[in-house]
Amino acid sequence: MLLFFKDPETSDKSERFNFKQVLTVMKLPQVWILCLILCCTYVMNMSYAYFNPYATSTLGVAMVGGTIVTIMADYIRPFASVGGGVLADRLGRPRIMTIAFAIMAVGTFAIALFPKMSVPVFVALCALVYVGMYCNYGIVFSLMDDGGIPMEVSGTAVGVICTIGYLPEVVCPATAGIILDTFTEAGYKYYFLAVGIIMLIGIVGIMIWNRSMKKQKALNK
């Protein structure tokens, strides 16, 4: 139990929380850009679960089949995460994230706009969305290496980015619930269209990030 206590005489005062670090971090534009990118990425993580009820209620897929569509994401995750990291190291993180956002946008728009598609096509689209989703989720924080965020506030920066970037965990279920309660089965279409638009916003976020990094490199020369 003594391991949980620190001697007040030996405590390092520099380790205490400093609110000024939060203010310093919130003044960094790259932190807000990362918040936007993470937020757009995590929207899909919180939305793919609706593929299951959409498949069973709109496409007429059996309950077992709808469950398989959701579980399939867990099997794709390790391959997409590792593969995305390898490709990001070779081709560049922003480029891979842009491609992944585009894949998610195309897949989600197709699911929303073509409700009479065949089940194999639907499963293939879901698989593509999962690949893009876990590819981005696996490399989003690696962008911090290029962001020029000072090491002394990097922990605080991660805290701020996560606090804002993970807001979809609260917002998405509430939003989806309101849309589905209002429009019933048609609500899936509207919700997926909104998700697709957010994926396009993610691409814009990457473009802003690239421009910010170019300016930063020019200033450092």
Protein language model annotation of sequence segments:
Residues 62-70, 118, 122, 154, ...:
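Juxtamembrane helix-start elements in MFS-like secondary transporters
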Residues 7-35:
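Juxtamembrane intracellular "pre-TM" segments in multi-pass secondary transporters
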Residues 148-184:
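A late C-terminal transmembrane helix in Major Facilitator Superfamily
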Residues 29-81, 137, 172-173:
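Extracytoplasmic gate region of multi-pass secondary transporters
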Residues 1-11, 205-210:
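C-terminal membrane-cytosol helix-exit motif in multi-pass small-molecule transporters
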Residues 178-199:
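A membrane-interface helix-boundary motif in multi-pass transporters
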Residues 93-143:
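C-terminal transmembrane helical hairpin of 12-TM major facilitator-type secondary transporters
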Residues 81-92, 180:
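Helix-to-loop junctions at the C-terminal end of transmembrane segments
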